[in-house]
UniProtKB/Swiss-Prot annotation:
Keywords: Acetylation, NAD, Oxidoreductase. Changing K193T: In allele Adh-F, allele Adh-F-CHD, allele Adh-71K, allele Adh-JA-F and in strain: Berkeley. This is Alcohol dehydrogenase. Changing P215S: In allele Adh-F-CHD and allele Adh-71K.
Length: 256
């Protein structure tokens, strides 16, 4: 079911990152009503740049670290919902790539995403009288097939794909739909230099960037196309400037 972003309210977690910033710019071209950016690092210059792209869209920034307790996330969302009244889309985009930082990688890439999602269900869940909503979770192609030298990062992205697929199946109960966008290797600061697990491959970043990559702008354009296609349960691959829906192979079924 296609979805128009015109006049919609969007919360973008990590909307100032590499792919995030370019995606925010693309979103603004769609004449949103509000773009609310939640990010750990304040970047007034980037916010000013975004505001200048489309003055018709209200761009708001709140500092947010996805590793905070869920009660703090709920408190922040209360502030946002009080201001906007409705929120149509949540984009969960926080991520780090550094397999030296095991606990933080899991906390940012997976636990933080789960907690932010859980918190917004307080406002969206139709069982609580909520209107429903749309969740777009940023995964990675490493969630399909790992970069084995960074197994912690790859494992968190596989978890994001699995969690989001479950959210999509719960949509008849909650009224909240969900899908993942999974970028391939994209030229951002995230991949210029990073650490492998236990230093199993000191040159992992250099070796990765020796293979075909995509610019973040091409990824951002397909990112927004995926949002507009709005397919509950979709597992989108955004690689080498293309957008493709992955057909996931079912090897087991719980039967419930």
């Amino acid at each position: 079911m296609s979805f128009t972003l015109t006049n919609k309210n969007v919360i973008f977690v990590a909307g100032l990152g590499g792919i995030g910033l370019d995606t925010s710019k693309e979103l603004l071209k769609r004449d949103l009503k509000n773009l609310v950016i939640l990010d750990r690092i304040e970047n007034p210059a980037a916010i000013a740049e975004l505001k200048a792209i489309n003055p018709k869209v209200t761009v708001t920034f709140y500092p947010y670290d996805v590793t905070v307790p869920i009660a703090e996330t709920t408190k922040l969302l209360k502030t946002i919902f009080a201001q906007l009244k409705t929120v149509d889309v949540l984009i969960n985009g926080a991520g780090i790539l550094d397999d030296h930082q095991i606990e933080r990688t899991i906390a940012v890439n997976y636990t933080g995403l789960v907690n932010t999602t859980t918190a917004i269900l307080d406002f969206w869940d139709k069982r609580k009288g909520g209107p429903g909503g749309i969740i777009c979770n940023i995964g990675s192609v490493t969630g399909f097939n790992a970069i084995y030298q960074v197994p912690v990062y790859s494992g968190t992205k596989a978890a994001v794909v699995n969690f989001t697929s479950s959210l999509a199946k719960l949509a008849p109960i909650t009224g909240v739909t969900a899908y993942t966008v999974n970028p391939g290797i994209t030229r951002t600061t995230l991949v210029h230099k990073f650490n492998s697990w236990l230093d199993v491959e000191p040159q992992v970043a250099e070796k990765l960037l020796a293979h075909p990559t995509q610019p973040s702008l091409a990824c951002a354009e397909n990112f927004v196309k995926a949002i507009e296609l709005n397919q509950n349960g979709a597992i989108w691959k955004l690689d080498l400037g293309t957008l493709e829906a992955i057909q996931w192979t079912k090897h087991w079924d719980s039967g419930i």
